[in-house]
């Protein structure tokens, strides 16, 4: 029997990650919301840990399906953490640092493991933010100071959404689109693979994962369907908190 592309990718997604832990090392001193609904997992085998989701796997439906969330969190994110821990075992002092601080200055990382730490550490950092950037009942538009900043930079929230969507659609292959602070100014940026804006001296506020594993089971290759659906679960409260903290 011929396997469809969707079936093949599903098989790859299930096999591609190795489940480790549902705990996590603090991300820039922040923890996800307490009471996360993901089940406990075995103790981690290194200093970096996968954060538990702050909501149930199916909590973002109908926009993001349960199966995608389960595989994305328990397999893909866990695989990034496993490989990151294997790499930092070769330079143990990195295990005493926050992943954000490592990514801000990768010259501190031994050249032999630098590429691995950049890729796997970026995957861990990006996804640890990503889970918190979404919530059940999310979406809508930002409020308060962030809303004013968005309007001042882009014209309106609608204009921001149009530009952000275009940037996310324009990511070639796998990567992310971000709303960032570059200094004290808002900007929309792309990063390839698991690169993070933090490595370029910018503060990520909001990011959408446009790797196919983030949407293929539900949307197949239709990234144009995934992006507007994802905007319905954005946790603007979390994004605003990051904005306020970064602006001081």
Positions of PLM-derived features:
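An amphipathic alpha-helical core segment
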Residues: 166-220, 227-237
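C-terminal segment of N-terminal export signals and the immediately downstream linker at the start
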Residues: 23-60
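Secretory targeting signals
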Residues: 1-3, 7
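Low-complexity, Gly/Ser/Thr/Pro-rich intrinsically disordered linker/tail segments
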Residues: 234-238, 242, 246-247
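Mature N-terminal segment immediately following signal peptide/propeptide cleavage
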Residues: 46-82
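Acidic/His metal-coordination segments adjacent to aromatic residues that form catalytic metal sites
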Residues: 59-61, 106-112, 192-195
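N-terminal export signals
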Residues: 7-29
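All-alpha RGS (Regulator of G-protein Signaling) helical domain and cognate RGS-like helical scaffolds
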Residues: 75, 81, 86-96, 100-182, ...
